A protein has these predicted regions:
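Catalytic core of DAGKc-family lipid kinases
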Residues: 1-97
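Hydrophobic residues in beta-strands and at strand termini
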Residues: 19, 73, 100, 169-171, ...
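Fold-independent oxyanion-binding glycine-rich loops
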Residues: 19-21, 28-30, 101-103, 135, ...
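Glycine-rich phosphate/pyrophosphate-binding beta-alpha loops
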Residues: 29, 33, 99-115, 183
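Short acidic/glycine-rich loop or secondary-structure boundary segments that cap or lie
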Residues: 34-36, 79-82, 105-110, 138-142
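Gly/Ser/Thr-rich active-site loops/lids in small-molecule metabolic enzymes
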Residues: 44-52, 103-136
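ATP/nucleoside-binding phosphotransfer catalytic cores, i.e., glycine-rich phosphate-binding loops
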Residues: 117-125, 132-206
């Protein structure tokens, strides 16, 4: 299959993400499930796919930690005159999980990145899909969050779902990050920027 792509594939210019000075291809994330991505045994990932993330993540639910964060991000909005323009917005809240993605799926879940029936995610549009999960106030809210994640319906009152080309994320304490499933260090301030069509990859023609 790989040989066929090399011989007859087409070039696709894909976005990549900058995380300060580091580069990531499909996801930068923090919070409750991020340790799962680099802490789950590879054998379990291979055998169970996205269920491995759920099974491993459940272990962390008894010790949910939230992070007070300020997220400043650039987005595109309609200016009311039939035109779009870039503007800057700020979100401040307590978050238990967040991910900045340029991917059609994460851990086997297609809608977690905003990809509803493959319509909402474009891999070379210069925009990240951003999901920020708020700290639940009680077990009922926690259950609602888990149901939303399991059913891949993430645009709820317990989450912020947005698109952005550039973000500045600040916190009072160090937060551990994962970049493409690998440990990305602890940070109190990170800048993420989408580099549009930064790399060329070969993809099948069909």
């Amino acid at each position: 299959k790989a040989a066929e792509v090399i011989a007859a594939g087409k070039v696709f210019a894909c976005d990549v993400g900058l995380f300060d000075e580091d580069v990531f291809v499909y996801i930068a994330a923090f919070g409750i499930f991020t340790e799962v991505s680099y802490g789950t045994p590879q054998e379990m990932k291979n055998m169970l796919g996205h269920m491995a993330y759920i099974l491993e993540g459940v272990k962390h639910l008894q010790n949910i930690k939230s992070y007070q964060m300020k997220v400043t991000y650039k987005t595109i909005e309609n200016n009311g005159f039939g035109e779009t323009e870039e503007c800057e917005k700020v979100v401040e809240d307590d978050f238990i999980f967040g991910m900045i993605t340029n991917s059609l799926s994460v851990g086997g879940f297609k809608s977690l990145t905003g990809n509803v029936m493959g319509k909402n995610v474009v891999l070379n549009d210069g925009l990240f899909e951003v999901t920020l999960v708020k700290m639940p106030k009680n077990p009922v809210e926690l259950n609602s969050i888990l149901v939303a994640l399991m059913s891949e319906k993430v645009d709820t009152e317990f989450m912020y779902c947005l698109k952005s080309s550039e973000l500045l994320i600040e916190s009072q304490e160090e937060v551990a990050w994962t970049l493409d499933g690998e440990y990305g260090g602890k940070h109190t301030c990170v800048k993420l920027k989408n580099k549009q069509k930064a790399i060329d990859i070969l993809v099948p023609t069909a």
